[in-house]
């Protein structure tokens, strides 16, 4: 089965293309998700600190929905992640492809996990074009071969992957705190000599 076979009516499309630099407006009503907002090896983004703009009559399709999958198609790293919550209206910049799936066929969390696995990543590596900034064509993404188990299995895989990602974030924080603690102790040793 191909990705194209599990899409919702809206399918796959590029995020919003701004004609000029995005100027953050703290009073803005719409968040703009950009590459700089992605953290922890593409595991999530910080909703509260993304740039905001005034609603400039964005088309409805550009507003992210819970369950959308965002895919980075430009550059060396091509990762996907699923939107699991939205605290306010957010659009994605043109750096991302927005993928809307038919949840009766495939779960968005499973699709994001699958697109980040070695088999899919190898497929994307083979399809990349461009020398300065490699990128993927929309059709190559649509033609991604998928393994689509039953929804119950997809859910189990997605939940396990989510727990693994949470563990990775926690372990990274522990490492960071431990490093800071040891550095502080070492500085204290030389200051007390």
Feature locations, PLM:
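A short beta-sheet element
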Residues: 73-113
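A short glycine-rich beta-alpha junction/loop motif
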Residues: 90-95, 130-155
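Non-catalytic DNA-recognition/assembly elements of restriction-modification systems
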Residues: 1-22, 27-28, 143, 148-193
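Sequence-specific dsDNA recognition surfaces
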Residues: 4-21, 37-66
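Glycine- and charge-enriched low-complexity intrinsically disordered segments
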Residues: 107-129
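A structural connector/turn signal
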Residues: 58-59, 86, 131
């Amino acid at each position: 089965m191909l990705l194209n076979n599990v899409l919702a009516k809206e399918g796959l499309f590029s995020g919003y293309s701004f004609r000029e630099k995005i100027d953050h407006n703290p009073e803005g009503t719409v968040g703009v998700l950009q590459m700089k907002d992605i953290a922890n090896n593409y595991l999530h983004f910080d909703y509260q600190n993304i740039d905001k703009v005034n609603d400039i009559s964005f088309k409805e399709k550009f507003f992210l929905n819970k369950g959308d999958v965002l895919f980075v198609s430009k550059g060396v790293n091509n990762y996907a992640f699923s939107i699991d919550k939205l605290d306010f209206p957010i659009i994605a910049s043109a750096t991302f492809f927005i993928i809307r799936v038919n949840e009766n066929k495939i779960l968005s969390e499973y699709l994001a996990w699958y697109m980040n696995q070695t088999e899919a990543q190898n497929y994307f590596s083979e399809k990349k074009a461009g020398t300065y900034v490699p990128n993927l064509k929309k059709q190559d993404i649509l033609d991604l071969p998928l393994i689509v188990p039953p929804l119950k299995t997809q859910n189990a895989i997605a939940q396990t992957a989510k727990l693994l990602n949470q563990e990775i974030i926690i372990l990274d924080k522990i490492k960071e705190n431990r490093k800071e603690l040891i550095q502080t102790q070492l500085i204290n040793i030389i200051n007390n000599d």
